[in-house]
Amino acid sequence: YIQVIFICWLSINSITEVYGKDPIGISLVKWSFRTQTAILCDMAKENGAVAIDMVDLEKWDIVKEKGLTVAMADGIDMGIERGFCDRRWHSSLIENYKRFIPLLAEKGIKQVVCYSGINTDLSDEEALEACVEGLKPLLDIAEKANVTLVMELLSSRNTEEIFTKQRFSYYQCDNPEWGVALCKKLNSPNFKLLYDVWHMNDMGRDIMSDIKKYHSYISHYHIAGIPERKGLNRTDSFNYQQFMKLLKKVGYQGYVGLEPDRIEKNLKSTIQESITLLKNK
């Protein structure tokens, strides 16, 4: 009984060390803010973010030296379009991830992104089986390294609107039902989903309902201003405070990555206002 209490205390204490009193940490997605990594780290710390997100190998040490966490590693994949549902890329993808997962463990990085890729030929079930074939060889090494492979849910909506460049036509993992089916097939604690709020809203999803249903399969979230994918704003059509409250209610203890579309001006004010909204201040 005493041992159980001690373990619980350690768990709570480790969360507090990382996030402060809040079990949810805010991270800034590297590609979204057009500035040097070190400068972005400083902006993050000034505004209460605790991590940098989607960080390439060569930038890992910069983030750590600044006293922040790498919330999600990037750059190990072959791009969003060339993913695990296409068997042509399996050998290269498996080689890449097998080589880099031990490095992630060495650096204390717990998560790395991966993608389904686009699918123009297979049925959903066939694409599912292809992903299982490609990902299964990685699970043993990921489990031993305590690194989680996280597949991102992205919008595949085909449209000529201005934000089309941030959508990916024929992207396979464009809904949580398919993603959860993949999680169940792989049956590993080291394979989870990245739920991108902007992308899933673009697909017409009920975000709150998805979180209630599928939160146990989700280890990471990305968010941007809805609908225009800028920084978060009080006039946006999405209730960011209710989103954060729901994450806490379902027991989420991870990062929410701020991922607007390539902010080049007013970075400080964009970061400050967005984090203020997420922290409900």
Per-region residue spans from a language model:
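Active-site acidic/histidine proton-transfer and metal-coordination neighborhood
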Residues: 86-192, 202
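Short, hinge-like loop/turn segments at secondary-structure boundaries
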Residues: 69-73, 89-90, 130-131, 168-172, ...
